[in-house]
Amino acid sequence: LSAWADKGWVPDVLGVDYAGLIAKSPHTEGHEAHDHIWKNLRAISSEFKILLLTASQVNKEGYNSWYLSKVNFTGSKGIWAHANAAIGINMSEFERDSQICRLNYIVLREQEFLGELPSKYVAVAGSPHRGRFHLISRFI
C-alpha cells in the first residue's frame, strides 16, 4: 500500500482473506498474537483511510445461532476492540436453499450517533452467483 500511496494511488477498499490466516509474529503468542494482527489491520485502515474488510470463523455454537454475537467467536477480544463494525452473516438450511442470508451488527463503534444498536436483522436475497442481491426486509 505504501508503494502505491507514494505513486498517488490508494484503494478505497482492501479485502483481507481472512484475518485468521495472517501469519503471527514470532514474538507473540495466543491472544496477544491475535490482538497484534487486529491492531495492525486497524492501523492500516486508519493510516490509508480505507475500508478494510476481512472475515473471521464462528465457533460451533455460531452454526446454530439465529443472530451472531461476540460469544460466537473464539480468540482475542482484540477483534472487538479494533473493529469499527463487525457484521454477522448467517443463514439456515432453508435460507441457503432460497439464497437468503441474514446480516446483523455484532459491534458498531460510535453507535451512540445511531442510538441503540439495532437488535433485529436485515435479510438479503438474490442470486449470489450473478452478484445480484436484493433487500427483502429491514432493521425493525
Annotate each predicted stretch with a short phrase.
Residues 12-49:
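Helical hairpin unit composed of two closely spaced alpha helices linked by a short loop
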Residues 54-57:
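Conserved H-loop
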